[in-house]
Amino acid sequence: MATLERKLVEMLKAPVEALGHKLWGLEYIQAGKHSILRLYIDNEKGIFIEDCAEASRQVSAVMDVEDPISTEYTLEVSSPGVDRPLFTAEQYQAYIGETVKVQLTMPVAGSRNLKGTVTGVDGQMLNLSVDGNELIVALDNIRKGNLIAKF
């Protein structure tokens, strides 16, 4: 996670939790005037559109005061959904035995895109079983990770 994203998580965690939700994670996608700050909120009872709207208002107010992003951006707030993005070691740990897809910054076993079963988490290292091979991936090498939904 980039430094700005870490700062944003720290800044926005309390306002989201004050609404009774958990800040699951966030993504900041820089693209000039089309940059996006995407927050994922979660709750044991589920997330509804009203929850997203309320969190958006709360987060917007904090962002206006703190102003950590000097350029234009669009704020999006949503639930993580069934193919939820994974951001932390704790989140990967919670999905041991489940299938995930990860996009890497640097290749592991010759690939930047891996799909496999989470077999463990050791500190900041993710253990994945990919096509019968056990791979170890540093969490800071994961650009994007998502749970693969089972239906």
From Swiss-Prot:
InterPro entries linked: Ribosome_maturation_RimP (IPR003728), RimP_C (IPR028998), RimP_C_sf (IPR036847), RimP_N (IPR028989), RimP_N_sf (IPR035956)
Domain of life: Bacteria
Primary location: cytoplasm
GO BP term, pick one: ribosomal small subunit assembly
CDD domains for the chain: YlxS_C
Subcellular location: Cytoplasm
Gene3D superfamilies given in the database record: Ribosome maturation factor RimP, C-terminal domain, RimP-like superfamily, N-terminal
GO CC, alphabetical: cytosol
Keyword field: Cytoplasm, Ribosome biogenesis
Stretches assigned to coiled coil: none
SUPFAM superfamilies: YhbC-like, C-terminal domain (SSF74942), YhbC-like, N-terminal domain (SSF75420)
Claim: Glycoprotein is one of the keywords in the record: no
UniProt family annotation: Belongs to the RimP family.
Biological role: Required for maturation of 30S ribosomal subunits.
Protein name: Ribosome maturation factor RimP
Organism, as annotated: Shewanella pealeana (strain ATCC 700345 / ANG-SQ1)
